[in-house]
Amino acid sequence: MTMDGDSSTTDASQLGISADYIGGSHYVIQPHDDTEDSMNDHEDTNGSKESFREQDIYLPIANVARIMKNAIPQTGKIAKDAKECVQECVSEFISFITSEASERCHQEKRKTINGEDILFAMSTLGFDSYVEPLKLYLQKFREAMKGEKGIGGAVSATDGLSEELTEEAFTNQLPAGLITADGQQQNVMVYTTSYQQISGVQQIQFS
């Protein structure tokens, strides 16, 4: 993921969200105006303006719905407006995390956001419970990528990652649960592209 040297955020405009500096060290997330002069408008080949479609700005709603369905009973249903609400929230969350990671790059005068920047941003923004398992995933992913290059690409990175992410590897990394505002305990859900089932970890498979 790359960013321009003069930019204070990375591709935030593509998510329909802008980020501005306050005091040179903080971001404020602001929605774009939904007007004809919005940054989401562009000129087509005929010179007329055409707004970007929602599917071009947000994550595919089918993928969002698939993840949501994994958290409800098989007989449960999800209303369209609920899917659209989560779709927009997820896109804003991506911009939120990326903006914080971008600020770190800006301070260190780097142009590329790496995995450590994302983990640092999540820790800074209060998502500490997810940092350790994601750190482990990032480490295993990089090891799998190195192995792929070493053997000429005969084994894909995700295959190598699937083999190394065992139940034992996650035993001491995942918290038992999260405590919500009402005092209820929630299980931690980890989203991976690995097809190996890990006992005690609920996984979402992406096709």
From Swiss-Prot:
Q: Which Pfam families match?
A: CBFD_NFYB_HMF (PF00808)
SUPFAM superfamilies found in the cross-reference section: Histone-fold (SSF47113)
Q: Name one GO molecular function term.
A: DNA-binding transcription factor activity
* CDD domains for the chain: HFD_NFYB
- A Gene Ontology cellular-component term: RNA polymerase II transcription regulator complex
* Renumbered residue ranges of the record's region A domain: 1-52
Q: Where is the composition biased (Basic and acidic residues)?
A: 39-52
User: Whereabouts does the entry annotate DNA binding, in residue ranges?
Assistant: 59-65
InterPro entries cross-referenced by the UniProt entry: CBFA_NFYB_domain, Histone-fold, Transc_fact_NFYB/HAP3, Transcrpt_fac_NFYB/HAP3_CS
Q: Where in the cell is it found?
A: Nucleus
Domain text: Can be divided into 3 domains: the weakly conserved A domain, the highly conserved B domain thought to be involved in subunit interaction and DNA binding, and the Glu-rich C domain.
Q: Which family does it belong to?
A: Belongs to the NFYB/HAP3 subunit family.
Protein name, entry field: Nuclear transcription factor Y subunit beta
Species name: Rattus norvegicus (Rat)
